[in-house]
């Protein structure tokens, strides 16, 4: 679970891979992780590594600053960053899902409005169910088979596939309109939560700070009358550095 309001700076989001170019910056804005983009040749991107899951539930809050420009793609990927499914906010104001070689429209979206998005992905059934504000808006097949889902990426543009292995090494031309900017597009995400419903689900790593008060309570129950290698006053600090906490699937 990611609560961005608890982060003091973008550097504290150590569980995320963040790609933040000058004209497509990623910043924190209160509880929101904000992705902006005015670069016609690049994009902002954030990616979260999660425990490998064959049956995955994910939820997040989503807000678009506009619905007449910009693109936000949400990819669900395996360990090799191969995407099996994609959700997308288009510059035409449509929230859609990719299935096979085609997209299926889910709903229209409005600028500045908060949406609570939930998705259930099944590697076994090769499909994704999408819910917005508690209402099911679509079911789409995966467009690529994957053994498990291990990453979630939010990106303000389409994936780059150029250059290829056959692209000439020497280029004697500039890209058209190099140096120009596009109108600014902005997207915000918050409260990203994932859970695996696999029968043999991989346990999620928990944040020690959420449980440190238990260690402090037990360490303070009795006076420390025997000197230890790690005194009670330092026990919680040592545990945070050396003992990871895991959520045990039921």
Where are these regions (language model features)?
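Short tryptophan-centered beta-strand motifs in secreted/extracellular beta-sheet-rich domains
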Residues: 60, 112-123, 128-130
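Short strand-turn-strand beta-turns centered on an Asx-Gly dipeptide
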Residues: 131-135
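Extracellular carbohydrate-recognition regions
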Residues: 1-18, 190-248
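Secretory/extracellular carbohydrate-interaction modules
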Residues: 29-97, 213, 219-226, 232-250
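Flexible glycan-contacting loops in extracellular carbohydrate-active proteins
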Residues: 140-188, 203-205
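Intrinsic-disorder/low-complexity, polar/charged segments enriched in Ser/Thr/Lys/Arg/Asp/Glu/Gln
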Residues: 1, 45, 55-59, 114-116, ...
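Extracellular/lumenal carbohydrate-interaction signature centered on repeated Trp-anchored short motifs
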Residues: 47-58, 106-113, 183
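Short, aromatic/His-centered strand-loop micro-motif at the edge of beta-sheets
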Residues: 96-118
């Amino acid at each position: 679970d990611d609560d961005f309001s608890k982060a003091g700076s973008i550097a504290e989001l150590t569980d995320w891979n963040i790609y933040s170019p000058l004209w497509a910056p990623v910043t924190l804005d209160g509880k929101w992780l904000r992705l902006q983009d005015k670069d016609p040749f690049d994009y902002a991107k954030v990616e979260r590594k999660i425990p490998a899951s064959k049956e995955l539930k994910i939820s997040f809050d989503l807000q678009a600053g506009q619905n007449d420009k910009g693109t936000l793609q949400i990819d669900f990927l395996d360990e090799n960053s191969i995407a099996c499914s994609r959700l997308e906010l288009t510059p035409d104001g449509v929230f859609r899902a990719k299935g096979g070689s085609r997209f299926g429209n889910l709903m229209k979206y409005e600028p500045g409005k908060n949406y609570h998005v939930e998705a259930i992905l099944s590697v076994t059934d090769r499909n994704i169910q999408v819910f917005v504000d508690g209402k099911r808006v679509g079911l789409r097949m995966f467009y690529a088979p994957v053994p498990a889902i291990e990453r979630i990426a939010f990106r303000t543009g389409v994936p780059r596939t150029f250059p290829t292995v056959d692209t000439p090494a020497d280029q004697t031309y500039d890209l058209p309109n190099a140096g120009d900017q596009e109108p600014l597009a902005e997207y915000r995400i918050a409260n990203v939560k994932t859970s695996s419903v696999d029968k043999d689900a991989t346990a999620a790593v928990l944040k020690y700070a959420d449980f440190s008060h238990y260690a402090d309570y037990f360490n303070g129950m009795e006076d420390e009358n025997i000197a230890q290698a790690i005194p009670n006053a330092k026990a919680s600090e040592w545990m945070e550095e050396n003992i990871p906490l895991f959520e045990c699937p039921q």
